[in-house]
């Protein structure tokens, strides 16, 4: 599996701070299984890639449900922004309509 990722979350995964990637559970994500490998490509530098192994998958109907159930400090938030973390943060990536259509997934990963 190959996915694009912006530089900030890519660095958070690389340093081990982010272990759960949040995505729409669309057709592409429905193909992912535990044990699979994902190659992330930096959206600003295609030569910068990162390979991870899928450890677990957490399916939810919405990011609101996901935010209530997963540890947000593992999802890319940190002590500086955890208090303002909101499911609406994900609407800059995925419209509410698409969230309602596909549902969402938290992909727990480990570095390879």
PLM segments and residue spans:
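A structural detector for beta-sheet-dominated domains
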Residues: 6, 23-25, 41, 55, ...
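Short beta-strand-centered aromatic/proline hotspots
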Residues: 36, 48-59
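Contiguous surface segments at macromolecular interaction interfaces
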Residues: 66-112
């Amino acid at each position: 599996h190959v996915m694009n990722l912006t530089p900030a979350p890519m660095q958070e995964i690389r340093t081990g701070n982010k272990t759960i990637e949040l995505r729409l559970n669309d057709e592409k994500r429905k193909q992912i299984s535990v044990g699979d490998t994902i190659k992330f490509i930096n959206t600003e530098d295609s030569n910068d890639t990162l390979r991870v192994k899928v450890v677990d998958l957490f399916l939810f109907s919405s990011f609101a449900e996901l935010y209530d159930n997963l540890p947000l400090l593992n999802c890319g938030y940190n002590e500086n922004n955890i208090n303002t973390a909101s499911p609406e943060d994900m609407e800059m990536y995925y419209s509410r309509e698409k969230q309602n259509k596909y549902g969402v997934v938290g992909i727990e990963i480990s570095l390879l």
